[in-house]
Amino acid sequence: MVTEHIFDFEWRPLQNYLRDRDIAIPPFAAEQESRSDALYNWIVSKGYSGKEGLNLGTYYHISDYGVIGLALLCAENVGDILKVIRAYVKLFNRDIANVGVKPRENYEVEIHISVNFKPEWNDASRQFHVNVIASATYKLIMDLLGNDFPISALTVPVHGADKTIYEGFFSLPVKHEGNDIIFSFPAHQLNRTLATANPAVFQSALTMAGESFNALLEVEMGGLRQRIELFLDSIPDQYPSLVTTAKYLRMNERTVRRRLADEGCTYRQIVDKARKERAIALLLNSSIPVDRISDILGYSETASFRHAFRRWTGQSTTEFRNSFH
């Protein structure tokens, strides 16, 4: 079995935080945990204030998350961002136990972040850790979605710390209760499209992220079928064969067939659905000739495309186009 490399994403922000404070990085034994884990635990052990935890969180940038950061930047909407984050947390981030989405009254949702603590940490260390995660999450939201993203409220658990620093730092109403960090915002924002959305780059980033991450993301996205649908949606012209798609997914063809059968569909059915949706979009939103649309969708003959379109819609391509003009 090939062991996937776990990238040490956290080293750079920790290094920059200490550099700006003229604090030397101590040496760590080679057999210790990852360098960033060792350095972070060392920082926590220094007894810095809760405000310093908030400051450290601002040092985390999208680029510090590697190809996962690229996937976040190019995701279609906020809902997809959360799916990527949940998969990332399960595989890479040992500081966070879980990220959950909970609907609330008044058409709002809450993003709950459950935090892990080291057994030896005291209240001050726990507060520092909570503040780092709250601040880094807030910065990630602002970097991805813009400073106008409407966060309506924030909950930050307090472990005997100064409560006066939070509202000024976040410029938000902040509550202090429970055990989770909670960001609240209008539910319809889950469908908000990112200005940086790019389906092709999103799919490319996922191929670089490793098999374990993709397996977790597939679960978050609702199965292999939806993963393939998103992949096909990112392709501007003729759809690939099952063999090519299987290579992209880093699976063999037989595994893809079996997994799709378990989900009650076939690759051909998924491609057929994708062709139908793209054909309708091209006929409605462009003046591209029908024979060119047939080529784009991968049909060897225009007659085959016309026959398929009538099967899908009960209309000819001409009838369909004329009915909307």
Curated annotation (Swiss-Prot):
Keywords: Activator, DNA-binding, Quorum sensing, Repressor, Transcription, Transcription regulation
Signal peptide: none
Annotated ranges, domain HTH araC/xylS-type: 226-323
Listed GO MF terms: DNA-binding transcription activator activity; DNA-binding transcription factor activity; transcription cis-regulatory region binding
DNA-binding region: 243-264, 290-313
Keyword Metal-binding: no
SMART domains: HTH_ARAC
GO cellular component, one term: protein-DNA complex
Pfam families named in the record: Arabinose_bd, HTH_18
GO BP terms, alphabetized: positive regulation of DNA-templated transcription; quorum sensing
Known role: Transcriptional regulator involved in both the repression (at least 99 genes, such as mexR and algU) and in the activation (at least 203 genes, such as mvfR, rsaL, vqsR and rpoS) of regulatory or putative regulatory proteins which are implicated in quorum sensing, virulence and multidrug resistance.
Additional free-text comment from the UniProt record: Mutation in vqsM resulted in loss of proteolytic and elastase activity, significantly decreased expression of lasI and rhlI, which are responsible for acyl homoserine lactone (acyl-HSL) biosynthesis, much reduced swimming and swarming capacity as well as decreased capacity of killing C.elegans.
Protein name: HTH-type transcriptional regulator VqsM
Organism name: Pseudomonas aeruginosa (strain ATCC 15692 / DSM 22644 / CIP 104116 / JCM 14847 / LMG 12228 / 1C / PRS 101 / PAO1)
Gene: vqsM
